[in-house]
């Protein structure tokens, strides 16, 4: 399975709120410049009121939860899974199956901030994460141009019947907290659109279920 977490709410603090007291206080506490820290609704909520599309931004915790679920799975440990994080600003993070994401959230934030600063982590040796500019369409085309997506509008199907398909697919899941894909074509052009029910689920919940189905199909469970 190749996971693409699309339009993720992961970005550095944008310039227009660098001078907001909430941002300055957080940056000062951490010994960094405002433009070097991740935008985080839990810390920067007062400042984010000034941002466009604020409801879909500032949620690095979504990426953290998804990577914890995916990177520590049997699928990834057996080399049968690879994750890509696409951000709303068209950055892509390629995550090695060998990367063990910090379980502590603050350590994860520090790691991603280092990644934005250096382009790869660790800075020396074989990178476990790499960051580069790339839009979602280009990424999906490079991954074969065929993908499945989880979306409320999709066909409901038992997980037991999805597993073998998910195991060999590029699987797209939204990495944003509210709303729908801004790139509508992600759903419209998908080879398969899956639904896990009428109720919207957190991205990490979707990933857990999809990974489990693929692991069963691969004989890992």
Swiss-Prot record:
Residue numbers marked as site, Interaction with substrate rRNA: 59, 100, 103, 107
Catalytic activity: a pseudouridine in rRNA + S-adenosyl-L-methionine = an N(1)-methylpseudouridine in rRNA + S-adenosyl-L-homocysteine + H(+)
Residues flagged as site, Stabilizes Arg-59: 61
GO biological process: rRNA base methylation
Top EC category: transferase
Key word rRNA processing present: yes
EC number(s) on file: 2.1.1.-
Binding site for S-adenosyl-L-methionine: 174, 179, 196-201
InterPro entries, A to Z: Alpha/beta_knot_MTases, Rbsml_bgen_MeTrfase_EMG1/NEP1, Ribosome_NEP1_arc, tRNA_m1G_MTases_N
Superkingdom of the organism of origin: Archaea
Any one GO molecular-function label of the UniProt entry: rRNA (pseudouridine) methyltransferase activity
Sorted UniProt keywords: Methyltransferase, Ribosome biogenesis, RNA-binding, rRNA processing, rRNA-binding, S-adenosyl-L-methionine, Transferase
Subunit structure: Homodimer.
Family: Belongs to the class IV-like SAM-binding methyltransferase superfamily. RNA methyltransferase NEP1 family.
Chain's role: Methyltransferase involved in ribosomal biogenesis. Specifically catalyzes the N1-methylation of the pseudouridine corresponding to position 914 in M.jannaschii 16S rRNA.
Name under which the protein is recorded: Ribosomal RNA small subunit methyltransferase Nep1
Primary gene name: nep1
């Amino acid at each position: 399975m190749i996971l693409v977490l699309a339009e993720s709410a992961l970005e550095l603090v944008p310039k227009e709120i660098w001078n907001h007291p909430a941002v300055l206080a957080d940056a000062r506490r951490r010994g960094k410049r405002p433009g070097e820290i991740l935008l985080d609704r839990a810390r920067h909520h007062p400042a984010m009121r000034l941002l466009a599309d604020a409801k879909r931004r500032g949620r690095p915790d979504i990426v953290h939860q998804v990577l914890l679920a995916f990177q520590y799975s049997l699928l990834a440990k057996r080399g049968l899974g690879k994750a890509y994080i696409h951000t709303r600003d068209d950055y892509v993070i390629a995550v090695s199956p060998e990367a063990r994401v910090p379980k502590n959230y603050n350590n994860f934030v520090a790691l991603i901030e280092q990644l934005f600063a250096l382009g790869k982590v660790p800075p020396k040796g074989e990178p476990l994460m790499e960051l580069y500019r790339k839009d979602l369409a280009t990424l999906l085309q490079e991954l074969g141009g065929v993908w499945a997506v989880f979306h409320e509008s999709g066909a409901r199907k038992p997980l037991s019947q999805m597993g073998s398909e998910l195991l060999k697919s590029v699987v797209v899941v939204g990495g944003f907290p509210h709303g729908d894909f801004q790139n509508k074509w992600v759903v419209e052009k998908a080879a398969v659109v899956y639904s896990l029910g009428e109720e919207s689920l957190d991205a990490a919940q979707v990933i857990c279920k999809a990974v489990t189905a693929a692991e069963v199909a691969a004989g890992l469970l």
